[in-house]
Design a protein with these regions (language model features):
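Short hydrophobic/aromatic beta-strand or adjacent loop that forms the aromatic wall/cage
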Residues: 2-4, 58-60, 107-109, 147-149, ...
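Outer-membrane beta-barrel "beta-signal"
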Residues: 3-14, 181-193
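Detector for outer-membrane/organellar transmembrane beta-barrel domains
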Residues: 9-12, 16-137, 146
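Conserved active-site loop/cleft motifs that coordinate metal ions or position small ligands
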Residues: 77-79, 126-130, 153, 161-168
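Predominantly the C-terminal beta-signal and adjacent terminal strand-loop region
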Residues: 157-187, 192
Length: 193
């Protein structure tokens, strides 16, 4: 079982999402947003393999700033998160290719987006930039990794329908472990009812 707690403070308008589920943008519809939050997550036997398990704890600080610019000039969104990981991952688990390995160390990301004010066709463009950095402690997990992302969303119906076009460059992987340096272009679709 995973235990998670999050405490947030809304300095400006209140975010409308309940509890731990937040949005990375409100597309300007919630007015001026500036929220800072602290979270903790713990899972006994939450990392490793079926035979080499270890506990996992994470401490997080995140923020969201969103500002609809006056005179219908669009919406600026800035978001970030800093995480500290405490993972009891054994050397034997790290050597196993089936390991769901988490690392001791820290990581962060920052992003900035600008929602253009005018519709083009059925939607609005939202160009953005994002940077992700993973910093594992010690040599068991390898060196740090990072990723740059430059892209644009085409917002058709808020979070319910959008397209994404992006270019990424870096060596960060889903596990945080440094992978090969990759430069990639991708296209995504988000549709939800």
């Amino acid at each position: 079982m995973t235990y998670v707690a999050r405490i947030s403070y809304n300095f400006l308008n209140k975010e409308s999402n309940p509890g731990y589920y937040t949005s990375s943008t409100y597309f300007g519809k919630a007015g001026d947003i500036f929220t800072v939050a602290f979270a903790i997550q713990h899972q006994t036997d939450g990392t490793g393999t079926a035979t080499q398990q270890g506990d996992f704890t994470a401490y997080l600080v995140d923020y969201l700033f969103e500002k609809p610019l006056g005179n219908n000039l669009g919406v600026l969104t800035i978001e970030g998160e800093y995480k500290i990981f405490d993972a009891e991952t054994s050397a034997a688990a790290l050597a196993d290719p089936s390991c769901f390995c988490m690392f001791d160390g820290d990581a962060f990301f920052v992003s900035a987006a600008y929602l253009l004010p005018k519709k083009i066709g059925i939607g609005q463009f939202q160009p953005y930039v994002r940077y992700v950095k993973n910093n594992p402690d010690g040599s068991n997990f390898g060196r740090g990794s990072d990723l740059y992302e430059l892209g644009t969303n085409y917002i058709i119906s808020g979070h319910n329908a959008r397209l994404n076009f992006n270019y990424t460059s870096g060596d960060a992987s889903l596990t945080g472990r440094a992978g090969p340096d990759v430069n990639a272009f991708s296209i995504g679709v988000q549709f939800q009812l």
